[in-house]
Amino acid sequence: MANPDTIFSTPIDKIGDFTFDERVAEVFPDMIQRSIPGYSNIISAIGMLAERYAKPHSNVYDLGCSLGAATLSMRRSINQEGCQIIGVDNSSAMVERCRLLVNAYRSDTPVTILEADIRDVDIQDASVVVLNFTLQFLAPADRHALLEKIYAGLRPGGILILSEKYIFEDENANELLIDLHHDFKRANGYSELEISQKRSAIENVMLPDTIDVHKKRFNDIGFKSSEVWFQCFNFGSMFAIK
């Protein structure tokens, strides 16, 4: 059973910026399930998409892999000779735990977990690239360049899977979706204090875009098609095909 997330359950005098440290890594499976609506569906479908798009003798990347949920879903689904998965995360706590989880089961599809900044990783001969709730934590000025690098490293016909929290230009719609997300967290046992303190900790480090901004970025870079394939409240996932 996952360790329960109680990080923000007691009053914090000075709330610092949210970081993916040892405390977060320890409770991350519980935190993510109780915080992101539809997370399990997204993870399952990433495996389905990887099964469809992974090619023999190609690389599959999970950028910002955290504890490897998407990596493991893809490994279970991919059955292509010479295909390998490369997971990358800059949190040493996440990488250490991810390696343990990956090594707990053997598979014909090799997996390498790297501790690195995803902006510094070479993307080469890729058939699938996953950014699962990762891009939103990069500085907005760095996002286009990373996606350009991913595009350059993808094979023609390759797929980028981008899961994100969204904001919406319609103020009323945006507020409703935020409120529904908070209702979701309440229904999963988070208190008003936890919701408030987590929001304060994360508001300066997670800066979401609109769906239109994502689509324009894909189009400007040269992806031939892109679309939202999953959305629940203000969270969702898109694909972009080279």
UniProtKB/Swiss-Prot annotation:
InterPro entries associated with the record:
CmoA, Methyltransf_25, SAM-dependent_MTases_sf
Question: Looking at the record's lineage, which domain of life comes first?
Answer: Bacteria
Q: Which residues bind S-adenosyl-L-methionine?
A: 39, 64-66, 89-90, 117-118, 132, 199
Fetch the Gene3D superfamilies from UniProt.
Vaccinia Virus protein VP39
Top enzyme category: transferase
CDD domains with a match to the protein in the record: AdoMet_MTases
Quote the EC number: 2.1.3.-
Keyword Zinc: yes or no? no
Q: Short name of one Pfam family for this protein?
A: Methyltransf_25
An example molecular function term from Gene Ontology annotations: S-adenosyl-L-methionine binding
The family database entries (NCBIfam families) matched by this protein are listed as:
carboxy-S-adenosyl-L-methionine synthase CmoA, PRK15451.1
What function does this protein fulfil?
Answer: Catalyzes the conversion of S-adenosyl-L-methionine (SAM) to carboxy-S-adenosyl-L-methionine (Cx-SAM).
The family assignment reads:
Belongs to the class I-like SAM-binding methyltransferase superfamily. Cx-SAM synthase family.
Q: What subunit structure does UniProt give? A: Homodimer.
Q: What is this protein called?
A: Carboxy-S-adenosyl-L-methionine synthase
Organism from which the protein derives: Aliivibrio fischeri (strain MJ11) (Vibrio fischeri)
